[in-house]
């Protein structure tokens, strides 16, 4: 296994643990991630897809992954998506486009 794949798998496992702890939903890695019709890296949160990223270039991760996860949202047929970006020291941030944030906000205000 190449080092980038190993790093990505580790980040996905860690993200699933973080999301399980924070949300109370049992979140797991989607082992079919990265294939055509990709539906995201993590499943277990109802009506939501999650993309995980541990790029060295965090700026790139924050710009690219939220756009990519939009395609995964359509593939999965879910209403909500988020990108989780790992920072040094195991710190995580959830990144959304303004449109993704608005979708979440409008649902919360219902």
Predicted regions and their residues:
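Catalytic phosphate/metal-binding cores of nucleic-acid and nucleotide-processing enzymes, i.e., regions
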Residues: 1-110
């Amino acid at each position: 296994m190449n080092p980038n794949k190993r790093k990505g798998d580790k980040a996905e496992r860690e993200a699933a643990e973080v999301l399980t702890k924070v949300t109370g939903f049992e979140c797991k890695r989607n082992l079919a991630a990265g294939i055509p019709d990709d539906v995201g890296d993590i499943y277990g949160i109802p009506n939501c897809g999650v993309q995980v990223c541990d790029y060295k270039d965090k700026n790139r991760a924050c710009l690219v992954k939220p756009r990519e996860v939009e395609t995964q949202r359509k593939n999965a047929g879910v209403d909500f998506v988020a990108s989780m970006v790992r920072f040094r020291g195991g710190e995580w941030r959830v990144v959304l486009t303004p449109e993704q944030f608005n979708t979440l906000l409008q649902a919360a205000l219902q």
